[in-house]
A protein has these predicted regions:
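Short aromatic-cysteine micro-motif
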Residues: 124-131, 163-304
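C-terminal, surface-exposed recognition/capping segments
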Residues: 40-50, 69, 91, 143, ...
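Short, solvent-exposed loop/turn elements at domain surfaces
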Residues: 143, 149-153, 195-200, 399-400
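A short, polar/charged loop-to-alpha-helix boundary motif
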Residues: 318-329
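A generic secondary-structure signal for well-formed alpha-helical elements
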Residues: 147-150, 195, 221, 225-228, ...
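GGW-centered surface loops in extracellular recognition modules
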Residues: 34-136, 142
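Short, low-complexity N-terminal tether/leader segments at secretion or assembly junctions of large
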Residues: 1-33
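Carbohydrate-recognition beta-sandwich/jelly-roll modules
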Residues: 133-180, 227, 351-354, 359-388
Length: 431
C-alpha cells in the first residue's frame, strides 16, 4: 500500500447492528422526551393512618413544592397559591349555554350579571332565556382533558390528575356520553337547581327546587333537551379530587368555605331557610366564608355542599352493598352497576373514618371520625333499601356537610324540603 492511501475500516455486521439499534433507542428517547414535555401529573397520596386532614396529604409528581390554594378569610379573598395557571383551573370559565348545548357567550368571571366584556348585561337570572348558566371545563385541542387515576397501595390512597391519559389507569369517565363517545368539555351547573314549571334550571336569583323524588328530578332535567341530566357520581368524584389536590387537605370546608349549613326554618313560605341562587355572582371562581350562613363557590359552582342535598346518578346502596356506575346510561335499580367492594350492615350514621380509592372513586368504608379528622364529613346508610346517593348536605346539617358528605339512606321515592337536584350537560357531538 502506497504512502498516503486512505484506509477505510468497516465494522462487522454485529457491531453495525448494535450501533443501529442504539441510535434508534437514542432517537426514540429524544422523541419520548419531546412527547412528555407538555404532560402534567398533579398527584396526592393520603395516609390512612393519619387522622389529621392536612398532614395526611402529601404532594406527588408535578404538585411537589406547590403552594396549596385556600380561602384567605381575614382578607376576604381566595388565594390560588401556585394553582392559578394549572390547566384545569385556567381552562374553566362561566358561560350561558343554550338548551341545544351551544355555548352562547362567556360571562364576566368576576361579575356574572355581565357578559365577558364587563359591560353588557347577561341573562344569568333571566328565566325567559333559552338555556342555563354553566361552569365549563374546556379540554379541547391542546388544552387537555382532566384524566383521573385513583388506587391504593398499602396504607396510602392515591389520586392523580393529568392532562393526558398517562397510562391505562387514567380514566375520563366524567366525559363519557350516553352513546359511549367521549366529549372534550364538561358542563357543570353554576347554581343549584331551580324549577321554572317545566324544567330544572341553573340561573341566579331563583328559589331552589325541593320536595321532588328521583324520577321527577331526572324528568325535569331532561326536559331541557338532549344531553341534560342530573349530576353523576363520576363528575362529583372528579371535582372533589380536583379540590383536594389543589388545597392539599381532606377538610373541604376549612379550605374553601363552610357553605350554608345552618338557617333551617320550618316554614314553606320561607323555603325552609334555603338561600336563593346567585348570592355569589360577584365573587369570582372560588369563594367562601367561615360562617355557616353563606354559600360556598368552587370552579364558578355555587352550593357544591350545604343549603340543599343534591341527588345524583351512578351511586347506590342495595342491601347494604355499595354499587357504582361511572358512565351513562344510569338507572335507579342497580342494573349494570358494579360492586365497589364496600358493604355496610343494618343502618346507621357517623363521621367518616376509612375510605377506599379505586376505579370507582373514593368512597367511605367505615365511620369513627369527627368534624376535624379524616374527611371531616358525615355518612348515613340504610342496608334495608335501595338507596340513591344524596351529596353535600343541607342548611340543617351543620358540620356534617362538605364535599364528601354522603347519604345512602334515602330511596329514589324520598321527597322532602331538604332534597332536590341540579342539571349537568354532556357536550353535544359536533355536526
Amino acid at each position: 500500500m502506497a504512502s498516503g492511501d486512505l484506509i477505510v475500516k468497516v465494522a462487522d455486521k454485529d457491531t453495525l447492528d448494535r450501533t443501529y439499534a442504539n441510535t434508534n433507542a437514542i432517537l426514540a428517547a429524544v422523541g419520548e422526551d419531546v412527547r412528555i414535555k407538555g404532560v402534567k401529573r398533579y398527584g396526592m397520596k393520603i395516609n390512612k393512618n393519619d387522622s389529621n386532614p392536612a398532614t395526611r396529604c402529601t404532594y406527588l409528581f408535578d404538585a411537589v413544592g406547590m403552594t396549596p390554594a385556600a380561602m384567605n378569610y381575614s382578607a376576604g379573598r381566595f388565594d390560588f397559591g401556585d394553582w392559578g395557571n394549572v390547566f384545569f383551573v385556567k381552562n374553566n370559565y362561566p358561560a350561558m349555554v343554550k338548551y341545544d348545548g351551544t355555548e352562547d357567550y362567556k360571562l364576566d368571571p368576576n361579575d356574572h350579571t355581565k357578559k365577558a366584556d364587563g359591560k353588557t348585561a347577561s341573562d344569568v337570572s333571566n328565566t325567559a332565556y333559552g338555556g342555563n348558566a354553566m361552569s365549563v371545563f374546556d379540554g379541547s385541542g391542546d388544552k387537555g382533558k382532566i384524566w383521573l387515576s385513583q388506587f391504593e397501595v398499602g396504607n396510602y390512597e392515591y389520586m392523580i390528575i393529568s392532562n393526558v391519559q398517562y397510562d391505562e389507569s387514567y380514566n375520563d369517565d366524567a366525559y363519557v356520553r350516553e352513546d359511549g363517545s367521549h366529549a372534550d368539555k364538561l358542563y357543570f351547573p353554576m347554581f343549584g337547581g331551580s324549577y321554572d314549571g317545566t324544567r330544572i334550571r341553573s340561573l341566579a336569583g331563583q328559589a331552589l327546587m325541593y320536595n321532588t323524588n328521583a324520577s321527577t328530578e331526572i324528568a325535569r332535567a331532561k326536559a331541557n333537551g338532549a344531553g341534560w341530566n342530573i349530576g353523576s357520581w363520576s363528575k362529583r368524584n372528579l371535582l372533589n379530587c380536583m379540590l383536594k389536590i389543589m388545597s392539599k387537605t381532606d377538610n373541604s370546608q376549612t379550605a374553601f368555605g363552610q357553605g350554608q349549613t345552618s338557617g333551617y326554618v320550618n316554614d314553606a313560605s320561607q323555603n325552609y331557610g334555603h338561600l336563593a341562587t346567585g348570592t355569589l355572582t360577584n365573587k369570582g371562581q372560588f369563594f367562601g366564608y367561615k360562617d355557616t350562613t353563606h354559600e360556598v363557590k368552587v370552579f364558578y359552582i355555587e352550593k357544591w355542599w350545604g343549603n340543599r342535598w343534591d341527588r345524583i346518578n351512578g351511586l347506590l346502596m342495595v342491601g347494604g352493598e355499595i354499587l357504582a356506575k361511572m358512565t351513562p346510561p344510569y338507572n335507579l335499580t342497580g342494573k349494570d352497576f358494579e360492586k365497589v367492594g364496600i358493604t355496610f350492615a343494618s343502618s346507621g350514621n357517623g363521621y367518616q373514618k376509612g375510605t377506599k380509592s379505586s376505579r370507582f372513586g373514593r368512597i367511605v368504608n367505615s365511620i369513627g371520625g369527627s368534624s376535624s379528622t379524616y374527611t371531616c364529613d358525615y355518612f348515613w346508610w340504610n342496608a334495608g333499601i335501595t338507596a340513591v346517593a344524596l351529596v353535600g348536605g343541607s342548611c340543617s346539617n351543620g358540620e356534617y356537610c362538605g364535599a364528601d358528605c354522603l347519604d345512602l339512606n334515602s330511596s329514589a321515592g324520598i321527597a322532602g324540603w331538604s332534597v332536590g337536584a341540579s342539571i349537568f350537560l354532556e357536550q353535544p357531538i359536533a355536526a
